[in-house]
Amino acid sequence: MSDSTAALRRKIAGAGDLHAVVRTMKALAASSIGDYERSVLALADYDRMVSLGLGECFRQARANPTAAPERVTAGASDPISAIVFGSDQGLVGPFNDVIAEHAIDVLPTLPGRAQVWAVGERVQARLKDAGLDVLGAYAVPGSVEAIAPLVAQIQIDTEARRAQDGPRQMRQVHVFHNRPQAASLYEPAGQRLLPLDATWQQSLAAVAWPGKVRPEVLDHGATTLGALIREYLFISLFRACAESLASENASRLAFSLASDSAQA
């Protein structure tokens, strides 16, 4: 057998292995999309309870302004924590480029120094190539069960960084991710999580407590408010991660279907 024939057979075998990998990833993507979408829906009740608690704290703060926390205005030198969700694996088309470019476009327009935490090797590389300060990187969770530990670690790391800030600094927190969108599979989204939006606070405070007996908020609401804000951040990051994973798998499935059509 000539060397060229042997090389050709190796290439054919390699192509067969690649097709098998693509088929496997296609099947996994199809089964995972529903899991991630259902996990977002499952957050709704908990999100509602946290929102009701926040609304009660905001109402008390309005009734007792001296107990409300001091507001600090963000300055040009204040840091920004940006969490960007991408992917570790390929075969997702422009998925990582889309969200990386969105973050790269938005962050320079914000008043502050951006410090980035990237979820996914591929989006991390894209952000570093753009010159952004990537302080941390995380592996993309492979299941719904792995999302909560990831979010908890992100909260620990970003909170540790916030603790290093000066007492007069206000660290903003932004999250960037792709979210499902019917017409084009997904679209890039960005949200400021901290500081809390004043209009949003007013809207929560305007929602009446559902029971006849209103809860008592202890410690002028400071301790309770801090705990509820941490839960609000957890919910927001969990939702962003789950939506990103649903979008990633939808993109991978579309890529696989396009590949199958091209081979037909």
Where are these regions (language model features)?
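C-terminal beta-strand-loop-alpha-helix "lid" module of Rossmann-like NAD(P)-dependent dehydrogenases
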Residues: 1-264
